[in-house]
From Swiss-Prot:
Protein's recorded name: Probable dipeptidase B
Active site residues per record: C26
Organism per entry: Streptococcus pyogenes serotype M3 (strain ATCC BAA-595 / MGAS315)
An annotated GO BP: proteolysis
The enzyme's E.C. designation: 3.4.13.19
Keywords, sorted A to Z: Dipeptidase, Hydrolase, Protease
Family classification: Belongs to the peptidase C69 family.
Domain of life: Bacteria
C-alpha cells in the first residue's frame, strides 16, 4: 500500500503506538499447492498503511460501458479505456475515492482472483534511467482496471504489461493473479520494466516491500512474461548484478534491504518453516523457498498474525507498553523490529483455491478480515456472491458504531492498549469461530458447486444468503465483545475510563 495522507482520527492509546514515516508496509505470501495439506493453492496479503483507515468490502456488478468511456484515477490522473463490458468482481476499496479507489483484492466472475499490491521501489540508479511515470498505472487503479477486463490470470498479467509498456508505471509494485491454472507473481520494477513468472507448485514465498525475483529464464515464454529491456536498463544504470554467472533481478533493481523488510521476510519464512536456514542478518531473501513441510489455511492465518512468536525479537509497537518510548520509524531498535501484524494493517485476505471448486465460484474461497486480524476473524466468501453485509459498506472516516472496520479497529485498540486484563481472550474466540467455519466450508462449497451447474442464479442466491447470515451474526458478536471491553477496561487514577 503506497503512501496516502488521509486525516483520520479515533482517540485511543494505540495512537501512541503507531509509527511515523508510514509510507508502505504490505506483506504478501504464496504457498504452492504441492505444499498444502489439502492440495489447495494459498496466497494473500495484509494491506498496511496506517491505523484508523476505513476499508469497505463490496461487489461491483457487471455493466456495459459507453463507447470511449475511460477509467480515471483522481489520485494521479491515470486514464485507460474501459472495456465494452465490465465483468462482475468483488473489491476491498478505500472510502475516499477522490484520493484513489484502491480496490485491492477480489474474484471476478470468471474465477480470476487478484491481490494488488505490495508496494516497492527501485534503487536511485535505476530510477534515473527509467523513472516512474507520475500519471502511470498505480496500485490505486490496478484491481479496478484488471479484474473487470480479463478471463484468465495470464490475460491479467499481459494487460498490466501492456499498460506499463504503453503508459508507464507510477510506482514499483508486486501483483499476484490466479485462476484454475495456477498463480502468477509479477514485479513492476521501474517506469516501463516488469517481470512475471508462473509460480511453482512446490515452493512458497513471503514478500514485503522489496523485489525478490532472482534469475529468470526469459526464453521460457510459457511461464514468463517480461519487458524487453530489463537487463539493458540495469546495465545502463550500472546496477547490473549477477549471481552464479546469471543476471539477478532483485540485486540489480533493489535499494539496500531495510529493517522493516528484513524483519518481515525473516519472520514470515520462519513462521511457516521454523527449520529454514535463513537468518535475520541475511543480505537478501530469495523469492522461491523450499521445504519438506506442508501447510494449512490456519498456518496462513498464523503468518498474517505473526508478531515474532518464537523469535528473539519484539514488535516495535510494544516499546511504549514496555516503557521504552515511541519508535520514530520502522527501523529496528535494540531487540524490537517491525512485524507482519502491526498497527497499520487495515485488512487481510487469503485466497484458498481448490481444483474441485468451479471457476463460476471463483475456483476457491477468499478468507477476509476487514480490520486487522490480530483480534478479528477471517470470514469465507465464494467468488459468485453479488452482495455484502451492510456493516462492510459504511463509509465514515471516523468511528462509526455501524461499521465493521471501525468496530474491529476499536476492539484491536482496546486489547493492544490493555494486554494484561484482556490477554488473548478475544483472539482465542475468533480462532474458535474460524475453526468452525473451516470445518463447514467444504460442505457449503460442495452444495453450491453442485447447484451452479443447473441453476447459477440459485447458487448465487444461496452463497449470498449464507455469507450475509454469517456476517450478521458475527458482527453482532463483535459489537458485544466491543461493549464488554469498554465496560471492563481499566480506569485511570481519577476513575475515568481510558480507551
Amino acid at each position: 500500500m503506497i503512501n496516502k495522507k488521509i486525516s483520520l482520527g479515533v482517540l485511543s492509546i494505540l495512537t501512541a503506538f503507531s509509527l511515523q514515516s508510514v509510507s508502505y508496509a504490505c506483506t504478501g505470501f504464496i504457498i504452492g499447492k504441492d505444499l498444502t495439506k489439502d492440495g489447495s493453492l494459498l496466497y494473500g496479503r495484509t494491506e498496511d498503511l496506517e491505523p484508523h483507515h476505513n476499508k469497505n468490502f463490496i461487489v461491483r456488478l457487471a455493466k456495459d460501458n459507453p463507447a470511449g468511456e475511460k477509467w480515471k484515477d483522481p489520485s494521479n490522473g491515470f486514464e485507460y479505456p474501459l472495456p465494452e463490458h465490465s465483468y462482475r468482481y468483488s473489491a476491498i476499496p478505500d472510502v475516499t475515492p477522490n484520493k484513489g479507489v484502491y480496490d485491492e483484492a477480489g474474484f471476478n466472475e470468471f474465477g480470476v482472483s487478484m491481490s494488488a499490491t505490495v508496494s516497492t521501489s527501485a534503487n536511485d540508479a535505476i530510477q534515473k534511467i527509467d523513472p516512474y511515470v507520475k500519471n502511470g498505472l498505480a496500485e490505486s487503479s490496478m484491481a479496478s482496471v484488471i479484474l473487470p477486463s480479463v478471463k484468465t490470470a495470464r490475460e491479467g498479467v499481459a494487460l498490466i504489461a501492456k499498460i506499463v509498456t504503453e503508459k508507464g508505471a507510477a510506482e514499483g509494485n508486486i501483483v499476484t493473479l490466479a485462476d484454475k491454472d495456477g498463480i502468477w507473481y509479477m514485479e513492476i520494477l521501474s517506469g516501463h520494466q516488469y517481470v512475471a513468472i508462473k509460480f511453482p507448485d512446490d515452493k512458497y514465498a513471503v514478500f514485503p516491500n522489496t523485489f525478490y525475483l532472482g534469475h529468470v529464464d526469459f526464453n521460457d515464454k510459457e511461464n514468463t512474461i517480461a519487458s524487453e529491456d530489463v537487463e539493458k536498463v540495469a546495465k545502463k544504470a550500472k546496477s547490473y548484478t549477477e549471481v552464479d554467472g546469471k543476471f539477478h533481478i532483485a540485486k540489480s533493481y533493489n535499494p539496500p534491504l531495510n529493517d522493516a523488510n528484513r524483519s518481515r521476510s525473516f519472520s514470515g519464512i520462519k513462521s511457516l518453516d521454523p527449520d529454514s536456514k535463513v537468518t535475520y542478518k541475511d543480505s537478501n531473501y530469495e523469492l522461491l523457498q523450499s521445504t519438506d513441510k506442508t501447510f494449512s489455511l490456519e498456518d496462513a492465518m498464523k503468518l498474517q498474525r505473526n508478531r515474532f512468536e518464537g523469535l528473539d525479537l519484539k514488535p516495535l509497537d510494544q516499546m511504549a507498553l514496555d516503557g521504552k518510548g515511541k519508535p520514530k520509524s520502522k527501523k529496528a531498535v535494540k531487540g524490537y523490529a517491525y512485524p507482519i501484524s502491526n498497527p497499520n494493517v487495515m485488512e487481510a485476505h487469503i485466497f484458498q483455491l481448490k481444483k474441485d471448486i468451479p471457476a463460476e465460484l471463483g475456483g476457491g474461497v477468499m478468507w477476509l478480515s476487514i480490520g486487522s486480524p490480530r483480534n478479528a476473524p477471517y470470514l469465507p466468501y465464494l467468488g459468485n456472491i453479488s452482495r455484502t453485509y451492510e456493516a462492510y459498506q459504511e463509509k465514515s472516516t471516523q468511528y462509526n458504531d455501524k461499521s465493521w472496520y471501525w468496530t474491529v479497529s476499536h476492539i484491536n485498540d482496546l486489547v493492544a492498549a490493555h494486554p494484561k486484563p484482556f490477554g488473548t481472550k478475544v483472539i482465542d474466540e475468533m480462532k474458535g469461530l474460524e475453526k468452525t467455519w473451516i470445518a463447514e466450508q467444504d460442505k457449503t462449497t460442495k452444495e453450491i458447486s453442485d447447484l451452479v451447474v443447473s441453476d447459477p442464479k440459485a447458487a448465487q442466491e444461496k452463497a449470498d444468503k449464507i455469507s450475509l447470515d454469517r456476517a450478521e451474526k458475527t458482527f453482532k458478536r463483535l459489537k458485544a465483545i466491543e461493549a464488554k471491553l469498554v465496560k471492563e477496561k481499566p480506569k485511570n487514577k481519577k476513575g475515568l475510563n481510558r480507551s
